[in-house]
Structure formats: structure tokens, C-alpha cells
Amino acid sequence: MTVAQIHSDCSSSMLPRHIKDDVEPIHLLGFNIARKPKWLQFVLLSGAIFILYLGYGYMQELIFKLPGMKPFGWTLTLIQFVIYSGCGYAECAVWHNTKRMIPWRIYGVIAFFTVATMGLSNASVGYLNYPTQVIFKCCKLIPVLIGGILIQGKRYGWIDISAAILMSLGIIMFTLADNKVSPNFDSRGYIMISGALLADAVIGNIQEKNMKKYGGSSNEVVLYSYGIGSVFIFTYVVLSGEIFSAIPFFLENSWKTFGYALIFSFLGYLGVNVVLTHIKVFGALVAVTVTTLRKALTIILSFLLFSKPFTIEYVYAGSVVMLAIYLNLYSKNKASWDHMIRIFVARAMGYHAVATKKDPMMV
């Protein structure tokens, strides 16, 4: 090799190069937090979940406290779907793509059940004690388990079945407590929220099955399911005549209807995205723990901020549901939880070092 070649190689090696950044971006409300310490990422994402969803729950209950709002749950859902669709399109256009992978007919089915889930859930708030609605939404495992068996032919173990039984017991206890203390007990609310849970179970199974089959992304599913769902809801509110009563009511109270609905919808959309990011970064177990604590705080704040009757039976029922949720989590993460339990017991008994060396299950 000549001196000139060596000089050329050395010079080229000293030139600045564009090195590909291997750190995968982690977006929180448009900001990349990938280079922040892990503990700070957890604090930021968890804090965002609490703020967004506590605000979402507060706005949802506040809207239905408006005199005369009770019959217009589907109009509120229409506004929510339009905003979700617009946000979904903007997100896909900027960060992803709007290409459709899943067939239209599948999206028609997904959109129908998405409409049923969110529409019935929103409408039920007008007829239910809000904490009861939150407790019911915590118990999605029951219809998901049934849907998994019927739609995908899945088989579940005794732990999952036990969790579903405990959830059913918790719901029954909450309903009986509601019936005991609520002066405006209305069975229509329970029918609506039960229908929402059943539809939600069907959605999850259909989405999972077809996203795997056709390779569709979660962003694509949000865009098309909410877009088509908006058309479904608009057709329904026109044919039922609800829209013609809702428009004068919304215009008469424009800030407290359109304003609250916009805030409610944006908080909901951002909340969904933050939860998905939390799952991606820290896993489903940690994310479910955070969201479960958030739901518990939502129930507490509902009792503090909005006057409603209270009984200690609510606490008992909520505790049973919480136990069922973590029993279900244990079923999904049995191997890792068993490992952590063994380590904890070993440390507590003072033979951690010996156990980790000799017990093959501790390795």
C-alpha cells in the first residue's frame, strides 16, 4: 500500500459519517422520550395515563350531569368517533401510512362491534352509577373468555375460569349494593354496559385474528374501524331521530356539550395511544397494574367530586374484582411470577444465595 493510499484511508476515516440511530423512538404526546432514563420514562408514561384517563372519566361523568343530556349518548359517541377518525388519519399520514391491509367486509364487522361497545358504554353513563360502570368495564375477561372459546376455539385453565367467576361475583355484589343505596336504580344501564362488554369481547377476538391473518397494524385498525363506525352511528341517529333533538340541545349549551365532548374525545384518543406505548416499553403486566390503579382512583374521585350514595359493600365488591384481575394476570405470567415468588420467599427465609445456586427453578 502506498503512502498516498494510507493517507487517503486515514483521511476518509476521519470524515464525519451519518451513523444510523439504533434507539427506537418512544413517543409521548409527540415528544420522543427514548433517550430519557427508564425510571423517567415510566414516570412520564404512567403520569400521562393517570392525567389523561382521570380527565376522560371526569369529563364523561360531567357531560351526563347536564340536565337533559341523558338521551343523547349516541350523539356524543358520534362526535367521539369523528374525532378519533380524524386523529387516526393524521397520525397515520404523519408517522405511518394509510394503506389498508384488512378487507372492507372485516372492517365493517369490527366497526359494528366498536360502535356497540363505545355507544352502549357512553349511553349507560346516563343510567348507571359511574363507579359501577367502571367496575363493569374492569370485568372484560368474562366475555373475552367466552368469545375466545366460541370464536377462536381457545381453551382456558382453571385460573382464568376462577378469575372470571370472581369477576362475576364482584359484579353481582356491586349491582346489589347499587340497588340498595341508589334512588335512581335503572336496569337499562346494566343491560347497556353488559352489551358493551359482550361487543368488546367480540372486537378483541376478531381484531387479533385478522391482524395476524392480514398483517394489519393497530393504527390502521383505529383509522378504518372508527371511520366506518362514524357512518354507522350517523345513520342510526338520523333514522332514530335522535340527531334532530340533539342538535338544538347541543347548540343551546354549546360549550358544555360540544366543548366537553371535544375535550373528552381528545383525552380518550391520547390515552389509548399512551397505554399502547406503555405496553410496548414496559410490558402488559406493568401497564395493566397502572391502568388498574387508575381505575381505582377514578372511582374514588367520582365519589369525592360528584355527590352519590356510598356503602362499604362497594369496597368489598371492588376488592373481589381487583383480586380477579390479578389472578388473571398471574395466569398470563405464571412462569415469571413463580420465579419472583421463589426469590422473595428465599430472601425472606435467609437462604437466597443457596437457593439460587442449587434450585434449577431459581436460575
Curated annotation (Swiss-Prot):
It is a multi-pass membrane protein. GO terms for biological process: 3'-phosphoadenosine 5'-phosphosulfate transport; transmembrane transport. The chain crosses the membrane at residues 39-59, 63-83, 106-126, 131-151, 157-177, 187-206, 231-251, 257-277, 281-301, 310-330. It holds the Pfam family UAA. The keyword Oxidoreductase does not apply. Belongs to the nucleotide-sugar transporter family. SLC35B subfamily. It is found in: Golgi apparatus membrane. Keywords: Golgi apparatus, Membrane, Transmembrane, Transmembrane helix, Transport. This is Adenosine 3'-phospho 5'-phosphosulfate transporter 2. One of its GO terms (molecular function) is 3'-phosphoadenosine 5'-phosphosulfate transmembrane transporter activity. Mediates the transport of adenosine 3'-phospho 5'-phosphosulfate (PAPS), from cytosol into Golgi. PAPS is a universal sulfuryl donor for sulfation events that take place in the Golgi. The keyword Transmembrane helix applies. Coiled coil: none annotated. GO terms for cellular component: endoplasmic reticulum membrane; Golgi cis cisterna membrane; Golgi medial cisterna membrane; Golgi membrane. It comes from Caenorhabditis briggsae.
